[in-house]
Amino acid sequence: VSWNVGFSYNRLKNYSRNYTMATGGDLNTSLSDYVAMRAAGMPSGLLGEDKDYNPYNNQDLGDWLSILGYNAGYMDSYNDNDKEYYSAFGDNNADGQWSPYLLQGGQLKVSERGSVDQYDLAFGINISELVMLGATVAITDLNYRYQSSYDEEFTNGNNLYLDNYLDTDGTGYSFNVGAIVRPADFLRLGVAYNSPTWYKMTDRYYGEAGSYLTFMDKGEMKERKLDAATPNNAYYDYEFRSPDKWIFSAAAILGTTALISVDYELMNYKNMRMYQTDGSSNVYTNQDITDNFKSMNTIRVGAEVKVTPQFAVRAGVAYSDSPKKKKKK
């Protein structure tokens, strides 16, 4: 009997990337149209922010994008009690009819930073080269930084912008156990279980928005510039359980020059869960997971042939199905 202990560090994910997307021409809809649609049903008298009232603290509203867009001048309503909204980017034409401004283009810039790092403490035991057992305890550290800037340009210099900031930090733990059995000299059978990673996470988020608008008022051209922001100390603590995984494998040595291996993995995406910090279930999110995800199956088959003592050729195929459930027609 022999045994060993090991420690390892792995960077599982690097989030660093920057990208820009832009579009031009006559676009049909604006971000302001989308925000106006989202705000439908909310009394406009409750969306406005002043020194005596903070709509972000109003539990009955619950949609910060609508609040931010309203205070940034994206949309208007007919009166303070009205619950229907329209994009502010337009004006009455010569016939008195409402005419939207031409949306000439939009641009999105995104910057992402962060990583997922894992620290493993592993233990293994070998029993007479017939049975090999292993176990690993892992601690995972996650940090993610997201910044985005979105701009739209209308005719006559009218414009809007939306900036988003998100910081996510979390720590998780997991364990893996496995065994390899050699019932015969030419055959190896293996099984392993990778537990979920249980994360404790914190999201910190902040948004800024603004607009510049020109319009006619009693025959006189006027302009309006508005800027708004969400509270800068907003955060959300939660817990997340990632999918667990089973692995089954077999390998056969054929003579002295060939090897065939088969691996099967079962990834249980349907077991993902979100929780509040008090341990209660995030009912709506978890129901979405149950409704939309299932287990994913992966099969890998490979073969290796040793052409010379120093050179071998290996080939293989793999198949995975989708973890997304098919929508019923």
Show the residue positions of the predicted features.
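Outer-membrane beta-barrel porins/channels
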Residues: 2-329
